[in-house]
Regions:
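Extracellular receptor-binding modules and their adjoining Ser/Thr/Gly/Asp/Asn-rich linkers
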Residues: 1-37, 99-112
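Extracellular attachment/recognition segments
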Residues: 26-96
Length: 112
């Protein structure tokens, strides 16, 4: 299941659009990463192309790594546990679904 995106702020700087928000994990994690689908928020950020950079961080000690996709709907977030092994495939553990502070920053090229 995709990570749910909640936008907190959008900053349209000179050449880029910076999007700040939170992610909510639910359902199951798949080996290789969970989908981060920006089409669900594209109208709010005026984006038609995938981000050029994404940062994700939480409060559980797990490590979140962005895997660039080719479109708005196929970005991925890979999760490694505190012991630096990938989170196992299956239901998300309570520490992640209960983390209400999984933050992200995404940078998009500004549409001209």
């Amino acid at each position: 299941m995709s990570l749910a995106i909640t936008i907190i702020d959008v900053d349209a700087a000179a050449d880029n659009v910076y999007v700040f928000g939170t992610l909510t994990a639910s359902g199951n994690y798949s080996t290789g990463g969970d989908t981060l689908d920006f089409t669900t928020v594209a109208p709010q950020v005026a984006a038609s192309h995938p981000p050029v950079q994404v940062w994700v961080g939480g409060t559980t000690g797990d490590n979140y790594a962005w895997i660039k996709g080719s479109a708005l709907n196929n970005q991925m977030v890979k999760i490694n546990t505190a012991s630096n092994t990938e989170l196992g495939s299956g239901a998300y553990p309570a520490r992640i679904t209960g983390d209400t502070n999984i933050q992200f920053e995404a940078v998009f090229n500004k549409l001209i």
